[in-house]
Amino acid sequence: MSRKGPSKKHVVLPDPIYGSTVVAQLINKILLDGKKSIAEDIVYSALDMVKEKTEQEPVAVLKRALDNIRPSLEVRSRRVGGATYQVPVEVKPNRANTLSLRWLTDFSRARREKTMAERLANEILDASNGLGASVKRREDTHKMAEANKAFAHYRW
């Protein structure tokens, strides 16, 4: 363990077009092989598609989508006397944001549309409407936590 204390949190600067840290975090999640300009093109064109389809502010739609994906509970493994229990714990806000962005990008990549921008735009739209694979992932996570409620007294 480190003797220097907890590590400092990385501060994400807002993106240049929308001035939003959420969009900047999404760009960083889409990023592959250090090609940030390509990731920016993908995210900005996806947000343009969202604006065309909904005629609403794309950042507001993105935030609504992330709110629908964000988990409040998750299960963590805890070993007690030779048995491993899935213990439900509350998700801290920072981790909840990270998980929602991760699920959004992962399930966007798994979609079948032609370009990544289309996949991301459609996943954002589905999530903002409470549909899509990323929202289903949150529901599954909550179901797991609910099913293992009996082990809640093992939480740390």
Swiss-Prot record:
Gene Ontology terms: biological process: translation
Gene Ontology MF: a single term: rRNA binding
GO CC terms in record: small ribosomal subunit
CDD domains, per database record: uS7_Bacteria
Pfam families named in the record: Ribosomal_S7
UniProt key word tRNA-binding: yes
PROSITE patterns found in the cross-reference section: RIBOSOMAL_S7 (PS00052)
UniProt function note: One of the primary rRNA binding proteins, it binds directly to 16S rRNA where it nucleates assembly of the head domain of the 30S subunit. Is located at the subunit interface close to the decoding center, probably blocks exit of the E-site tRNA.
HAMAP family reported in the protein's UniProt record: Ribosomal_uS7_B (MF_00480_B)
Record family assignment: Belongs to the universal ribosomal protein uS7 family.
The protein's name: Small ribosomal subunit protein uS7
Gene name, Swiss-Prot/TrEMBL: rpsG
